[in-house]
Amino acid sequence: MRSWLLLLVGLSSYFALSTSVNRAKNSGSDFDLESRASTTNVNSILSKRKLRAPGGDTNTLKDSGKARREKKVWKLFCRVFLQLDDEKKCMFETNQVSSHQPEPRPALSFMPGPKPAHSLVPESKPVRSLMTGNAPVRSIATKLKLVLPRITETVKNPSKSQVVMLWLHKVAEFSRSEHGVNTMSYRTLYEWLSPSFSDAKLAKFFVGLREDEALRETAEKMLAYMLIKSTSTEAVGRAWLKSGEHPSRLFESMNFKEADFKDTVFLGWLKYASLYEKHYFSQSELTDYRRQLFFYRMYDYIKPMYSYEKTQGFLEYKFEGLTSIPGMQDFGQNLADIARRERKISFYLDSEFTPEALFNYLKVSDENLLTNVFQWLRYCRRYTMAYKYVPFDELEFLEEKLGEISLWIYQVYGKL
């Protein structure tokens, strides 16, 4: 009878223990299993559940009948407890139900739209400590030079790397500062990134960054540098041409203050204009007119950067210098020819040529139509501005001289 009673008490303890474990497990309790499992012991569990070992201590149990019964129950409890895994032990130890669920950590998003560097929290502690401080970008880059390649060597897309994106936001902030305008080197920026990413990946990456207002200027200047760099020209050209960006729009967004032919960024823009011209203008008679229009537009963007005195022959000389750059021989020569024609327009105005007289002098109606018709039309525009009292209708005059093609030429010229 006594043995059956002991067995019943033992089973009751076991089922009570299992019920507590299952209840705790199903409640979704959140525990630090590793730390709790290392400190779990029977006495601590008993004290939390307001239980006690027989006689207060298993080592000092008295050898009485009641003590022997309690000791058997205690041993059965300990045997069942020790067979549980660590998770169930921890649940049984705490016996606490928590309804609090930790809020999910929001995913970091870098594009599109600008995000200040200090609002982004990378996982890397060294990077976080650098980015949240006020250290100059150059010193940050020196320290990140050890971090960047190691972290990004397995990242196929730079935009997926928190370190790269956060760092570039910091670089962009620095480049807009008074000190950064004079010291920012895109060659150095390229050298920092190129060990981790190929030119093709960098080109595609920076073309995409132009959609981010905070990084647009940095991206465009970086692309301009890579365009003029012989080893990366082809990769950047393909990526930029794929975007279909017209050079005139890039010129406006880059906000050039002066046409410095020694400036890598300005030369990079000219290089892209050359690639654009070769890519979008096929060899045909009608397309040749649009190509001439394209070169006049490039000239009109550059000319206002110089004073009147310098434009007299100065731009012609500078454009001829572009012919020494590989891949820009024809582009530079076409711009030099236009600069030469524009210089002659000033001479024709000083000589008081009438539009009719200049049309015959340039032999526009002969085989020189493509070369000279836009020069003549530009002269007519300046002539009517200088001599407003002399009415002249260039379209009517062209129809009389050239016939049907005159209307198409005038429509193309109207886009200039």
UniProtKB/Swiss-Prot annotation:
Superkingdom of the source species: Eukaryota
Stimuli inducing this protein: Expression is up-regulated at the earlier infection stages.
Keyword field: Host cytoplasm, Host nucleus, Secreted, Signal, Virulence
Signal peptide: 1-20
Compartments in which it is found: Secreted; Host cytoplasm; Host nucleus
Record motif RxLR-dEER, residues: 49-88
An example Gene Ontology CC term for this record: extracellular region
Function summary: Effector that partially suppresses the tobacco programmed cell death induced by cell death-inducing proteins.
Protein family: Belongs to the RxLR effector family.
Domain remarks in the Swiss-Prot or TrEMBL record: The RxLR-dEER motif acts to carry the protein into the host cell cytoplasm through binding to cell surface phosphatidylinositol-3-phosphate.
Protein's recorded name: Secreted RxLR effector protein 25
Gene name of the record: RxLR25
